[in-house]
Regions:
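Extended beta-solenoid/beta-helix repeat architectures
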Residues: 101-117, 121-212, 228, 255, ...
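Short amphipathic alpha-helical surface micro-motifs
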Residues: 20, 55-57, 94, 115-116, ...
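Surface-exposed beta-strand edges and their flanking turn/coil or helix-capping segments
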Residues: 50-53, 87-90, 96-98, 126, ...
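Terminal amphipathic alpha-helical/low-complexity segments used for targeting or macromolecular assembly
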Residues: 1-115, 286-288, 292-343
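A broadly conserved detector of short glycine/acidic/proline-rich loop/turn motifs that flank catalytic sites
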Residues: 6, 33, 41-42, 79, ...
Length: 343
């Protein structure tokens, strides 16, 4: 909690900045109504010399970080995040490298093949087995703390691997991939974002996909990310095919909501969307799978609400996590929305 003097200093600084910038539009970021950052367009910065804003010379602001943003990247849909992910990893590597006290010596262990090791960041407690290739020639590789990388793994940057991740033997990970905290992966993965606690521990191809938290992809689950005719991929967020929208992309795989699960040998079509807590066991599911679907087709029944909540608790407890009351409320609200829309 900020004391009143500090809060007043922040408010005063913001008011002074606005007065000196005049009527130009700037973007303020706040937490509990307290400003902690501001985005000032480049043209405004050129017109108003930032060093001329007197109060910024105060020692109070010397620890502030000024970041030049050449362009604004707008993320309207999840596939936009996939398009920016590789560049974002590179940016993160530049910011993280000076501050991380990692374990670079592990890259010199016999049997670990690191290409352009100066672009690889390894956190403390991470274990890398023999016969692992870390190829950072195309981009940085960021590996968090207490990660386990088993033998015969190949990782091509730019890639991000969060803390406590398990990468199983024989995994092939390609550029633009991010693995969230405590995820467990195997098989082939490219240009994919895993949120935390994802589970893909068996062979299967996954590319150009966004995978929510607590998702489990069964053995042999494969995802198509390119149409046979190489045309632009269209997606929909309901069963109404007339409401499909164009992604403008020729490569897009699976967009999977939290707690979604697929059975063994499931094959997802190009640009498939699944809602929250969907259970997909039809080997060729529809391109849109409702939240809490029990099967994966438009006419599939819904998973029972109480069983879905209890399953979420069970899955999370296996990773020593608890389903918060707020999370349970979100799941119940989504259940009401989904079942109502299907009536």
């Amino acid at each position: 909690m900020l004391d009143s003097a500090l809060r007043q200093s922040l408010e005063t600084a913001w008011e002074q900045t606005l007065r000196q910038l005049g009527d130009e539009t700037v973007l303020r970021f706040t937490h509990n109504s307290i400003p902690f950052a501001a985005y000032i367009p480049e043209r405004v910065a050129r017109q108003t010399q930032m060093q001329d804003i007197a109060h910024l010379d105060s020692p109070f602001y010397h620890s502030a970080l000024q970041i030049a943003i050449p362009t604004i990247k707008q993320i309207r849909y999840l596939w936009d995040a996939l398009g920016y992910n590789a560049a974002a990893i590179e940016d993160d590597a530049q910011l993280l490298k000076p501050s991380i006290q990692g374990d670079s010596e592990i890259l010199t262990v016999p049997g670990v093949f690191a290409q352009q090791a100066d672009r690889i960041i390894v956190g403390e407690g991470t274990q890398i087995a023999p016969c692992v290739v870390l190829d950072a020639r195309k981009g940085a590789i960021i590996i968090g703390r207490n990660v386990e990388i088993q033998p015969h793994v190949s990782i091509v940057g730019p890639c991000f691997i969060d803390d406590d991740v398990l990468i199983k033997a024989g995994t092939r990970m390609y550029e633009g991939t991010s693995l969230g905290i405590a995820s467990k992966v195997a098989g082939e993965i490219k240009n994919t974002i895993f949120q935390g606690f994802g589970n893909k521990q068996h062979d299967g191809c996954l590319g150009y996909s966004f995978i929510g938290e607590w998702v489990n992809l069964g053995a042999g689950t494969d995802v198509s990310d390119l149409k046979n005719n190489y045309s632009t991929i269209r997606v929909r967020f309901s069963h109404d095919k007339a409401r499909e929208i164009s992604t403008g992309k020729t490569s897009l795989g699976l967009l999977a909501g939290d707690h979604t699960k697929s059975a063994i040998n499931t094959s997802f079509n190009t640009g498939t969307v699944t809602g929250v807590s969907a259970n997909v066991f039809d080997r060729a599911p529809d391109k849109y799978v409702s939240s809490f679907s029990w099967g994966g087709q438009p006419d599939s029944p819904f998973f029972e609400e109480e069983k879905a909540i209890e399953l979420a608790r069970t899955v999370m407890s296996r990773r020593k996590r608890e389903l918060l009351a707020e999370e349970e409320l979100l799941l119940r609200n989504e259940y009401k929305r989904s079942t109502k829309n299907d009536e």
